[in-house]
Amino acid sequence: MSSLLDKTRMLNRILQKSGTEPVDFEDICDLLSDVLACNVYIISRKGKILGSKFYSGFECEEVREVVLKENRFPDFYNNKLLNVNETLSNSPNHDKCVFDNLKDCSINNKLSTIVPINGNRERLGTLLLARFDKEFTDEDLILAEYSATIIGLEILRSKQDQIEEEARKKAVVQLAIGTLSYSELEAVEHIFNELDGTEGLLVASKIADKVGITRSVIVNALRKFESAGVIESRSLGMKGTHIRILNDKLLEELKKIK
């Protein structure tokens, strides 16, 4: 039987293996499921399942259907989890389905342990463990809470990466817009008003006639955006030019100019 120290070292190896890359939540679920002999779910604050692992022989069809098909827990159940502010261990289901109290659970003596995932003074999600017949020990709970701390740090890092990526995309769009002349900017506004969503067909001559500018102004504006990686364009000959927006901040930044 592995000691608590051995199990903790296994978790540390996942961190060391990842280096600068994000930790794979599935790896944490696999390890916890193996060493704790239980089902493991990592759930975001909004109920999305970030990682999960069913322990061999401990499969609940109701939960499996939710995990595999929906990839999220029902809102009412997720709200119950969020109301747990500190580790709740060995909570019995009283032989009732956790998703429907009117239905009997197909497996008797199910015990759940709920570990809040917190970081930066906010609730980030929940680590949910489920086992049958055998209670979680203090050692199990120490490992679960340590895992929740690791997961919390990874969620925070992921959120920070997302914020930085959003800022980078905005900066790229702003730089691309800054290279346009007044007439090119006017052309760009009309071009993207003509598009249906994030991609569509553009006939430069029609827009040139409509706005009262030369076709070359439109072509130059599109080239500048394409070289900045903001859009992708493909000539279809007489039919026109197919344009696809690659940077989802483009339309948002153009609206600000208006």
From Swiss-Prot:
One of its GO terms (cellular component) is cytoplasm. Keywords: Cytoplasm, DNA-binding, Repressor, Transcription, Transcription regulation. It holds the Pfam family CodY. NCBIfam families: codY_Gpos, PRK04158.1. Transmembrane segments: none annotated. GO terms for biological process: negative regulation of DNA-templated transcription. The keyword Transcription applies. Residues 204-223 bind DNA. DNA-binding global transcriptional regulator which is involved in the adaptive response to starvation and acts by directly or indirectly controlling the expression of numerous genes in response to nutrient availability. During rapid exponential growth, CodY is highly active and represses genes whose products allow adaptation to nutrient depletion. Its main location: cytoplasm. HAMAP family: HTH_type_CodY. This is Global transcriptional regulator CodY. GO terms for molecular function: DNA binding; DNA-binding transcription factor activity; GTP binding. It comes from Clostridium botulinum (strain Langeland / NCTC 10281 / Type F).
